[in-house]
Design a protein with these regions (language model features):
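Glycine-rich anion-binding loops and their surrounding alpha/beta cores
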Residues: 43-45, 50, 98-101, 106-109, ...
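Active-site cofactor/substrate anionic-group-binding motifs, chiefly glycine-
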Residues: 85-147
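N-terminal basic, low-structured, amphipathic or hydrophobic segments
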Residues: 14-19
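Charged, compositionally biased N-terminal leader segments and the immediate start
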Residues: 33-46
Length: 390
């Protein structure tokens, strides 16, 4: 049976008219795993929600390498049609966290400092530059430690890993080296494929199915350093509250999950942004506008980016070494808005306006650019040390 036929039989529809040939990853020898998989696929195929334990078990089945491409396609297709629940997201994320390579920075934890992540889902297909990556350096420049989780481009021209490489940052570091970056520089990059190596078992099915899947949502939910504060952009407004609730269940203390009215998975400067705020275990939803941050509105066209080289040039201009070469326009403003949210989430800033003021100081003092330069130099140095060691 082809994966297309399997998906049709399971869901009653053709998923995005996708033809996916069935290729098995291997035999399942444990009869309990066979039973779990068949029961789970039957349940979700009928449009019923999985329990947290069932979702955990399904992801365990995938990450352990027992699942076939056909099973993974069926699961992802059914979830796409049915829609994910908080319990399912928490179950999937719990299994991914269990399999993840952990990062253990020590200095911030010893001092009781927050650790921030600005990882979003990606997938908004708007072609903007890497706003959350630029914002991460602004946050670090303001004195808040950052564990930036990210990946290469999947649905856009340039992912966070791509632009960081173009900025001179090594992304192929060992876990201990990433922890040193966070401890000594104040910011480190957690390259998702290296941190979540077991997700390789799902890559073929994901690519063959095409489009966004639950794995897009799981990135912000599975920070390997256990970030306590987050700003997570989502590609669809309906996911904001769902993701905020899941983050709370997973132990994050404060978060802003955002979706711009112009379709951005960032806080927008073009108009309204939907916000789901997690604080003290509760989630509330509201909208913000650029004026709340003391910023001018600007159209989407003014913040578009390009490939990794072009986006790196934009970030260099936003974080310019001198006032003469520093950009003062929409690129800078959207970075300040998103950095402000991360600073509020961390507790460093008291509100949006205070956050923008701190973000502006981080840029104009040169501190944000210093963090970028320091991470590039340090990552190159430690990567070189590990390769020259006997």
């Amino acid at each position: 049976m082809s994966a297309r036929t399997a998906a049709e039989n399971l869901c009653g529809v053709l998923v995005e008219k996708t033809l996916v040939p069935l290729r098995k990853l291997g035999r399942i020898e444990d009869p309990l795993l066979i039973s779990m998989t068949q029961d789970t696929l039957k349940k979700i195929g009928a449009g019923k929600d999985l329990t947290r334990a069932e979702a955990d078990g399904a992801m365990e089945h995938i990450l352990s390498g027992h699942a076939t491409d056909s099973e993974i396609v069926e699961l992802l297709a059914a979830l796409r049609i049915k829609g994910e629940t908080v319990e399912e997201l928490v179950g999937f994320a719990t299994a991914m966290r269990r399999y993840a390579t952990k990062i253990f920075p020590s200095n911030y934890a010893r001092r009781g400092e927050p650790l921030v992540d600005t990882c979003g889902t990606g997938g908004d297909s708007k072609g903007t530059f890497n706003v959350s990556t630029a914002a991460a350096f602004v946050v670090a420049g303001a004195g808040v430690r950052v564990a930036k989780h990210g990946n290469r481009s999947i649905s856009s021209k340039c992912g966070s890993a791509d632009v960081l490489e173009a900025l001179g940052v090594r992304i192929d570091l060992e876990p201990e080296q990433v922890a040193r970056c966070i401890d000594e520089i104040g910011i480190g990059f957690l390259f998702a494929p290296a941190m979540h190596a077991a997700t390789r078992h799902a890559m073929r099915a994901r690519h063959e199915l095409g489009g966004r899947t639950v794995f897009n949502l799981l990135g912000p939910l599975t920070n390997p350093a256990g970030a306590s504060a987050q700003v997570a952009g989502v590609y669809k407004a309906g996911f904001a509250e769902l993701m905020a609730q899941a983050l709370g269940e997973l132990g994050v203390k404060r978060a802003f999950v955002v979706h711009g009215g112009d379709g951005l998975d960032e806080i927008s400067i073009g108009g309204e942004t939907c916000v789901a705020e997690l604080r003290d275990g509760a989630v509330r939803s509201y909208t913000v506008v650029p004026e709340d941050f003391g910023l001018r509105r600007a159209p989407l066209e003014s913040i578009l980016g390009g490939d990794a080289k072009q986006n790196a040039q934009i970030i260099h201009k936003v974080l310019g070494r001198s006032l003469l070469y520093r950009e003062h326009g929409p690129h800078r403003d959207i970075v300040r808005a998103n950095a402000a949210a991360a600073l509020v989430a961390s507790g460093r800033a008291t509100d949006w306006l205070n956050g923008v003021r701190l973000a502006t100081e981080s840029i104009d003092s040169g501190a944000a650019r210093e963090r970028l330069d320091a991470l590039a130099a340090f990552s190159q140095s430690v990567a070189g040390d590990s390769r020259s060691a006997p």
